[in-house]
Amino acid sequence: CSELKPEATLEQINQLPGYFVNLATQLKNGTYDAWEKEFRIQDYQAYSDINVWADRLMTKHYSCLDNLTGIAVEANDEIIVLVGNTHGYPVALQCIGEETTSFGEEKNYVQTAASGDIYFLKEGVNKITIRNRGQLFVMYTADLQSNPTSIRIHIPLGSGQVTGYFDLQRHQTNEKYAELLSKATDKYFGVKGEKMIFYFHRSEMLKHVRTEILSAIHLWDNIVEWEQSLMGIDKMHANQFNNHLFAISPEGAY
């Protein structure tokens, strides 16, 4: 769903439905914009079932929003999603927008929604009409003891808008973080660590952490790791549980 066979010809490409001609031509010629391609074509790993592990660990639920896409969508957008081999596992998109609450305050305020619309995917071409604006997250849940393989998903050009996110494992440096944050366009920006995900207002991050994020994400990764070590998770359930905690920046209650 993300590359052409070497023997594919321009004549064959031009016989494709109109939407795919430009996409296939860019893939063949190597002219797919690098910024777009990094987030539109990703291999998504499996994450453990938060409901199973909340019961097993006797804790509150961790987040199921482990797989950020870095792609924002608007209500009524029609998007194409190309899904590779799912290896028999169910996979879906969840669109996370905003909700209004009054928790802890006398008046209502806005915060990131705890959940959103879910769109189930199949292998091959999926056409989806988005119901509400937000950012897309891939939902890929599996028993990690079955050694699930990553799933490649391609959300092609013209489907949503790339806003990006920072992945500590992949991007590694403050310099790359600053670059990604400066290019982002959505209201919220994601930072994915080993144990923790920040999903904060981009405007506030530009004000307060424009060029440096490593110390903060390392600190919170370490705090979660220490908590899990005290609970015996790594010792008793090694390589079985890998969900993140998910931190948001509500517009009230503080």
Kindly give the residue locations of the regions a language model identified.
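Short amphipathic alpha-helical surface micro-motifs
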Residues: 61-64, 118-121, 172-174, 179-182, ...
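Beta-strand-enriched, solvent-exposed domains that form extended recognition/catalytic surfaces
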Residues: 3-166
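Catalytic cores of extracellular degradative/oxidative enzymes
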Residues: 178-180, 187-254
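Low-complexity, Pro/Ser/Thr- and charge-rich linker/hinge segments at domain boundaries
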Residues: 154-190
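Alpha-helix capping and helix-coil boundary motifs
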Residues: 17, 172-173, 209-212
